[in-house]
């Protein structure tokens, strides 16, 4: 990670709250310009810890989580930004708000909860054309006046950029396949 930081890379994504909590505090003390994004699932019981570690939560995917995150952000006057995760493929095994429910969910998060939603995130199905899902996410973002789009990973990031991605997740393209890493 440090060679990338020294080369000028400042935005990093992490999938796991506890792993990030163990890894990043020392690095951030030395490199305060780092912006850290949670791009993996977030459990409500880890919200407090996540908000101490991350600048951006990209995986707001249900109302109970949105309420918990909003309560912490508002109570502690944090500057954390949030993305709504949209399950564009409506896959039952994946997290995210369904495309048909996205507008109402975004409105509820922003206007009822005061959640600082700045964008949307999606992970397209592996067996479908990614561009269809990126276009759908872009349409939802445009309807809701959201400027940030987190879409595209190592295999399809160039397509995502063509559809307006402002963040791409290319960890394995840079670091190689993820090895098992456990925090005890």
Q: What residue ranges belong to the model's regions?
A:
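Conserved alpha/beta-domain cores
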Residues: 1-147, 153-155, 161-163
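C-terminal helical cap(s) of enzyme catalytic domains, especially alpha/beta-barrels
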Residues: 24-31, 158-184
């Amino acid at each position: 990670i440090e060679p990338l930081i020294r080369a000028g890379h400042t935005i990093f994504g992490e999938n796991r709250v506890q792993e990030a909590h163990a890894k990043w505090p020392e690095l951030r003390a030395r490199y305060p310009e780092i912006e850290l994004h949670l791009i993996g699932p977030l459990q409500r019981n880890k919200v407090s810890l996540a908000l101490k570690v991350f600048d951006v939560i990209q995986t707001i995917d249900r109302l109970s989580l949105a309420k918990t995150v909003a309560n912490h952000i508002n109570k502690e006057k944090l500057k954390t930004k949030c993305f709504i995760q949209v399950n564009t493929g409506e896959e039952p095994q994946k997290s995210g708000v369904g495309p048909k429910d996205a507008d109402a969910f975004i409105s509820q998060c922003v206007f009822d909860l005061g959640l600082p939603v700045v964008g949307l995130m999606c992970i397209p199905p592996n067996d479908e054309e990614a561009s269809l899902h990126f276009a759908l996410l872009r349409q939802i973002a445009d309807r809701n006046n959201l400027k940030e789009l987190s879409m595209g990973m190592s295999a399809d990031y160039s397509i995502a950029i063509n559809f307006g991605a402002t963040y791409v997740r290319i960890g394995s393209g840079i670091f190689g396949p993820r090895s098992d890493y456990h925090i005890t």
